[in-house]
């Protein structure tokens, strides 16, 4: 395992540095590192690392979501209003509709199988989008109109909506029926996640304040460890109560961080955000190298040109969905184009659930996985490069 960790960090950082030298986003190098070192090419990563890959990826995602929550200005988010809510489900819904309408014609699957494929593909990647929106907030690009805050909030909720739909469509493809309860669970999951996170965040704030008043000074480094541990517990709670009620653990993590920012002094929240930013340097490498390692590149050839056509058509539907979310806002056409670009990347969810239909024995399983792999390899570079190279031209600096 130690050798694997050494390879992940050293080769991942080296490839990231090379990509940055040629003006490409570093995550492209990390993703390529994972693909090459992973089990489907050189097979240099130990099974023990790959066995806990999903948990490590989730931990890395927790770190960037905590930084996001500690950087998020809620007053700016309030300015945005309803588009932030619409961005959490409208673009994904449009993309799924694109698959349902065109996948049977282009790829020869049934409508239900097309719905399963659309649900796999519908989520934007918070791992790609969130750190970039945090960077924009720190640099002051688009913050006057709350653009990065809106995209960050939408990307955090988007996954919940898509995963619930995926579970429902998968049941239908296996001969089951859609359950109204599954759809009701979407808002319940979001609301309970926010409430749980806010409660835990407030209790943590009170704990730190009480310790300070009793002359037990808790260092910010210690606070970081406590917050990280509590975040892991929130995700564990999501699993513990899943049989009874749905709670979004990741949304609870963001809400907890937001509550800590609101209640704490500016100095403390800024210091904590900086510390999570430093932790993200290592977490980002782990996340994207392991996402790359989960990608079976052999399925790229199986997907073929028709899969590429389908991905492109569905992304056009997604772009229309993003534009609809912007209706009634004061955003310029440049800012709307940026929102479309920011909502392109696929990675985290697709790497996590892309192989589930195949494991479930669906006849479309191989095709779904092939399309998911192709989408990751294509949209991560395009989305990351698109955001990094256009935000200074498309957004206003505050």
PLM regions and their residue ranges:
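Transmembrane helical cores of multi-pass secondary ion antiporters/exchangers
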Residues: 1-398
């Amino acid at each position: 395992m130690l050798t694997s960790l050494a390879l992940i960090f050293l080769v991942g950082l080296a490839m990231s540095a090379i990509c940055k030298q040629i003006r490409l986003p570093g995550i492209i190098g990390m993703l390529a590192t994972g693909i090459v070192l992973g089990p489907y090419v050189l097979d240099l990563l130990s099974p023990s690392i790959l066995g806990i890959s999903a948990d490590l990826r989730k931990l890395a995602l927790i770190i960037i979501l905590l930084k996001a929550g500690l950087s998020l200005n809620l007053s700016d988010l309030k300015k945005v209003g309803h588009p932030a809510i619409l961005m959490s489900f409208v673009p994904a819904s449009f993309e799924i509709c694109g698959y349902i309408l065109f996948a049977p014609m282009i790829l020869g699957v049934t409508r239900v199988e097309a719905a399963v494929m659309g649900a796999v593909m519908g989520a934007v990647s918070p791992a790609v989008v969130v750190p970039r929106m945090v960077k924009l907030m720190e640099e002051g690009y688009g913050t006057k109109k709350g653009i990065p805050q809106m995209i960050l909030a939408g990307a955090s909720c988007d996954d919940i909506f898509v995963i619930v739909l995926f579970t429902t469509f998968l049941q239908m493809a296996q001969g089951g029926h859609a359950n109204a309860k599954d759809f009701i669970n979407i808002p319940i999951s979001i609301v309970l996640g926010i409430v749980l996170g806010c409660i835990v965040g407030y209790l943590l704030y009170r704990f730190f304040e009480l310790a300070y008043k009793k002359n037990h000074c808790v260092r910010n480094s210690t606070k970081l460890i406590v917050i990280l541990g509590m975040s892991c517990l929130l995700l564990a709670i999501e699993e513990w109560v899943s049989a009874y009620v749905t709670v979004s653990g990741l949304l609870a993590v963001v809400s907890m961080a937001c509550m800590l920012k609101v209640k704490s002094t500016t100095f403390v929240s800024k210091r904590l955000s900086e510390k999570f930013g430093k932790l993200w340097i290592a977490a980002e490498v782990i996340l994207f190298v392991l996402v790359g390692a989960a990608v079976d590149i052999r399925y790229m050839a199986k997907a073929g040109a028709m899969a590429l056509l389908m991905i492109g058509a569905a992304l056009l539907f997604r772009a229309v969905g993003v534009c609809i979310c912007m209706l009634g806002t004061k955003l310029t056409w440049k800012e709307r184009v940026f929102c479309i670009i920011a909502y392109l990347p696929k990675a985290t969810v697709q790497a996590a659930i892309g192989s589930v239909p195949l494991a479930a024995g669906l006849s479309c399983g191989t095709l779904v996985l092939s399309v998911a792999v192709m989408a990751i390899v294509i949209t991560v570079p395009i989305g990351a490069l698109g955001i990094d190279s256009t935000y200074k031209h498309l957004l206003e600096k505050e």
